[in-house]
């Protein structure tokens, strides 16, 4: 269910675009699917988790701007803005001696601070890379290619996460060595 909420709007957008070949109609689907994903997420969890709220909110804002102005630029730059924001948040947090990824994922993982720092920098670099590549594709390719690229980012993200699993497993605290992590509630 969580995967549907997290990726459903992007997949619905891609399907709508390739069925209709109309970016505006696909943007309507993106906006509606993003709103539905937030509603489903709230209905299931009785709260809006921070990241789905961020992604859904950005899709609603940029999708709505695209519809109002009749331009595909807003939806296309959404990928850049989101990924730059995440990269800045993560890398900036490390520079300020904070552990932003630990706050977000701390309940699920118990890692030493040095491992959190490394993992945070890796995620920050990944998000910065995606933002840069999106700008290259957005500015050099046609809309069909950009939509294919956007859909390809979904499995690429899963592969990136999978490549981090060995590092996380290696550094996970075991048994009595695990510290009880009490990050702030990420829900709203």
UniProtKB/Swiss-Prot annotation:
Keywords: Cell inner membrane, Cell membrane, Membrane, Transmembrane, Transmembrane helix. HAMAP family: YciB. It is a multi-pass membrane protein. The lineage of its organism: Bacteria, Pseudomonadati, Pseudomonadota, Alphaproteobacteria, Caulobacterales. Plays a role in cell envelope biogenesis, maintenance of cell envelope integrity and membrane homeostasis. InterPro entries: YciB. Its main location: membrane. It comes from Caulobacter vibrioides (strain ATCC 19089 / CIP 103742 / CB 15) (Caulobacter crescentus). The gene is yciB. The chain crosses the membrane at residues 23-43, 49-69, 73-93, 116-133, 149-169. It is found in: Cell inner membrane. Belongs to the YciB family. This is Inner membrane-spanning protein YciB. Signal peptide: none annotated. GO terms for cellular component: plasma membrane.
């Amino acid at each position: 269910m969580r995967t549907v909420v997290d990726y459903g709007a992007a997949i619905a957008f891609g399907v709508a675009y390739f069925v209709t070949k109309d970016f505006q109609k696909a943007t309507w689907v993106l906006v509606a699917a993003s709103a539905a994903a937030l509603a489903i997420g709230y209905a299931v969890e009785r709260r809006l988790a921070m990241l789905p709220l961020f992604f859904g909110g950005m899709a609603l804002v940029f999708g709505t701007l695209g519809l109002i102005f009749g331009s595909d630029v807003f939806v296309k730059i959404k990928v850049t803005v989101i990924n730059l924001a995440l990269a800045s948040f993560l890398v900036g947090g490390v520079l300020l001696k904070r552990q932003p990824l630990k706050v977000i994922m701390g309940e699920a993982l118990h890692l030493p601070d040095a491992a959190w720092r490394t993992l945070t920098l890796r995620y920050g670099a990944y998000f910065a890379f995606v933002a840069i590549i999106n700008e290259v594709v957005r500015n050099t390719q046609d809309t069909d290619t950009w939509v294919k690229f956007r859909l390809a980012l979904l499995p690429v993200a899963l592969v990136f996460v999978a490549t981090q699993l060995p590092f996380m497993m290696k550094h996970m605290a075991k048994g009595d060595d695990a510290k009880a992590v009490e990050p702030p509630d990420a829900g709203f």
